């Protein structure tokens, strides 16, 4: 039995209503779902299918696509059909703004092909048309038995609601700050829309809410309030998180705090990709976040020290990098061949200070020699030292031991 362990207690999640989207369940007692969104022109069937397939293959359980005009709506059933022919059964979420009622009404094949609709109360319609157009979308969802995400975004808030709350706040003896009124508007917009959708006929088990803002502290405040006031399933995401490290850090901090409080049933890490960048990165970051917090296990963990003046070379860094890359590359096949392999923990350490201890805590680990240490690398499996490697082929020998361990422990034959 493995000796790899965590000292933390299991995290308790907020109770929410389960919503079924295709073959994926969001909320209830289901694991937190990772989702993503394409950035292709949906009318370009080839490009959109290719990107959806790439996102699904790295682990996106739901994929959202823009449906912004007739050509995009007409392409949706073709996209779904093409994906199914390729063997990719991916629940597709249609992202609608401004004319969703028109597109869903005039393109019934699109309405049927999608697994879920996303609408924004702030731009579903304006003035006298808003109520009618919102109701039309909900009625279509009821007709086709599709769940809906009511996705509020503070960049496109319902101005009528915002103005009313601002006016009411101004009459108070101790008025709230503008930021507090903005946050309350986001929450009320989501909740009022959900209640209204129910009154039209949509079931509580067909509603997911999101309330996205671009500031970390505001996001935490908004979702904390939303979670207190309802039991709808919640979609977490920091909108306009940005590019590169900043985007990853901002999203991880905001979502991590909420997840630690038990809030959140599905997440998306919204990263602005660099020109020519890999769209799948947002999926990998979401998976890493859920894994390091102990909510999900997607792939083996490789623990490696950062290196310091005690380490003699970059060998342990190169070995750790290669092992992690090989494990990740093989996971698509290994999940079937070696059930449970995603729980594996490997340690690749660079000196005697923490090397042996960390290696003992892993399923399998190696402690490479540092400055002044004997040129030997002990290997530990499930807490026991099983071998000492020496010479110029330590990396290759450890990789061989790792492969044998995976086959022995997780193989079915």
Curated annotation (Swiss-Prot):
GO molecular function: 4 iron, 4 sulfur cluster binding; 4-hydroxy-3-methylbut-2-en-1-yl diphosphate synthase activity (ferredoxin); 4-hydroxy-3-methylbut-2-enyl-diphosphate synthase activity (flavodoxin); iron ion binding
Residues annotated to bind [4Fe-4S] cluster: 305, 308, 351, 358
Cofactors named for this entry: [4Fe-4S] cluster
GO biological process, one term: terpenoid biosynthetic process
Manner of cofactor binding, per the entry note: Binds 1 [4Fe-4S] cluster.
Lineage top rank: taxon: Bacteria
Pfam families per the UniProt record, alphabetical: GcpE (PF04551)
Assigned keywords, A-Z: 4Fe-4S, Iron, Iron-sulfur, Isoprene biosynthesis, Metal-binding, Oxidoreductase
HAMAP family: IspG
Family that this chain belongs to: Belongs to the IspG family.
Protein name: 4-hydroxy-3-methylbut-2-en-1-yl diphosphate synthase (flavodoxin)
């Amino acid at each position: 039995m493995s000796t790899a362990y965590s000292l933390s207690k299991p995290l308790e999640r907020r109770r929410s209503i389960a919503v079924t989207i295709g073959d994926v369940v969001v909320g209830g007692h289901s694991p937190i779902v990772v989702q993503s969104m394409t950035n292709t022109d949906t009318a370009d069937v080839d490009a959109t299918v290719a990107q959806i397939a790439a996102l699904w293959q790295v682990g996106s359980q739901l994929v959202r696509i823009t449906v912004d005009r007739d050509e995009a709506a007409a392409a949706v059933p073709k996209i779904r059909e093409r994906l199914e022919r390729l063997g990719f059964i991916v629940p597709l979420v249609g992202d609608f703004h401004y004319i969703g009622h028109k597109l869903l009404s005039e393109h019934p094949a699109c309405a049927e092909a999608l697994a879920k609709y996303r609408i924004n109360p702030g731009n579903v319609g304006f003035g006298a048309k808003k109520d009618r157009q919102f109701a039309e979308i909900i009625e279509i969802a009821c007709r086709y038995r599709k769940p809906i995400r009511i996705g509020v975004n503070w960049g496109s808030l319902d101005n009528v609601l915002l103005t009313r709350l601002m006016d009411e706040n101004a009459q108070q003896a101790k008025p709230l700050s503008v930021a507090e009124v903005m946050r309350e508007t986001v929450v009320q917009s989501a909740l009022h829309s959900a209640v209204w959708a129910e009154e039209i006929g949509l079931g509580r088990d067909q509603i997911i809410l999101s309330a996205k803002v671009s500031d970390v502290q505001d996001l935490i405040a908004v979702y904390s309030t939303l979670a207190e006031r309802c039991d709808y399933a919640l979609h977490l995401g920091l909108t306009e998180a940005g590019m590169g490290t900043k985007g990853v850090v901002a999203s991880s901090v905001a979502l991590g705090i909420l997840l630690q409080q038990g809030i959140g049933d599905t997440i998306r890490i919204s990263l602005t990709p660099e020109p020519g960048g890999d769209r799948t990165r947002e999926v990998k970051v979401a998976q890493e976040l859920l894994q390091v917090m102990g909510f999900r296990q997607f792939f083996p963990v490789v623990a490696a020290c950062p290196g310091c003046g005690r380490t003699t070379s970059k060998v342990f860094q190169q070995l750790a990098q290669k092992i992690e890359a090989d494990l990740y590359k093989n996971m698509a096949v290994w999940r079937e061949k070696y059930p449970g392999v995603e729980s594996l923990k490997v340690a690749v350490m660079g000196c005697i200070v923490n090397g042996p201890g960390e290696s003992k805590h892993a399923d399998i680990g190696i402690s490479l020699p540092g400055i002044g240490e004997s040129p030997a690398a002990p290997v530990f499996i499930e807490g026991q030292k099983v071998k000492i490697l020496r010479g110029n082929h330590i990396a290759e020998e450890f990789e061989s031991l790792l492969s044998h361990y995976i086959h022995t422990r997780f193989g079915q034959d």
